[in-house]
């Protein structure tokens, strides 16, 4: 809304056209979302506490987690509020990519909200039945995939880009693109959700990956930079840099309250939504493989659960890890919670920098 107002004023008043620059609006989006999170955070936490929306803790996990019982959860709603308001203020609402990403984010957040609400408020340990949880997330992801696939106007928008190799891309076709997009959005969403198990563990890697995707989005949406760096030019994709800025700002604001010892937890409402947002943005800017690299922590956490379950069933009750997801394994191996979190942050930072290097190493 502010963008449209600024551009309208810019027709008669010199200086307002500066708000048309994506770089400026990305910074403003980050600052706005950060301010909203920091300002609204205490009130949201008090409301959650008053409604007794507290975290339930498994008694078979690390004993140190027992002290977390009752900590307000569903704080991811704060992140979504900050992102939503920020995008309405600074995003280009004429851009289809902005709307697709926003609707996917809010849609996955709604599924997470219902799941959390049933678990915490209705005291249903299963929450939203798994089949319905995956049905609704799949429906949203598939809807976005079909829209993006059918609205593609150039071959570059549906090609799989291979990093580190110049001009190496595999045409997926509409159906291949839809299938890949579905798995990226849904997979990233649930991977981030599995990672969200320790104070600050999931949100900071999400911020790091979003920050890197902002750079990829800006490059992909800029005809000159995309040609110079050998990245597919996707008209309009640059606006997603503003969305990434909002994720970074909202995420850092949430981390203020989620850092150890956490005053609030994100819950499925935040984790599912943020993962879906990252997946959608990566698909639009054609960096699915790079997302796999930068989000290596999310991948490792997911694989640890899959391997643990498969091995447990195949071996008749034996386990590879002390506990899955992976962060619990290290906790039970003697690492303190803060050590696990910070070390996983460091690993993510290295992976993100490695992913960014693909812009030049071709």
Curated annotation (Swiss-Prot):
CDD domains (alphabetical): GT_MraY
An annotated GO cellular component: plasma membrane
EC supergroup of this enzyme: transferase
SS bond list: none
GO molecular function, one term: phospho-N-acetylmuramoyl-pentapeptide-transferase activity
Pfam family for this entry, one: MraY_sig1
Membrane topology per record: Multi-pass membrane protein
Transmembrane helix found in the keyword field: yes
Function: Catalyzes the initial step of the lipid cycle reactions in the biosynthesis of the cell wall peptidoglycan: transfers peptidoglycan precursor phospho-MurNAc-pentapeptide from UDP-MurNAc-pentapeptide onto the lipid carrier undecaprenyl phosphate, yielding undecaprenyl-pyrophosphoryl-MurNAc-pentapeptide, known as lipid I.
Stated name of the protein: Phospho-N-acetylmuramoyl-pentapeptide-transferase
Organism: Azoarcus sp. (strain BH72)
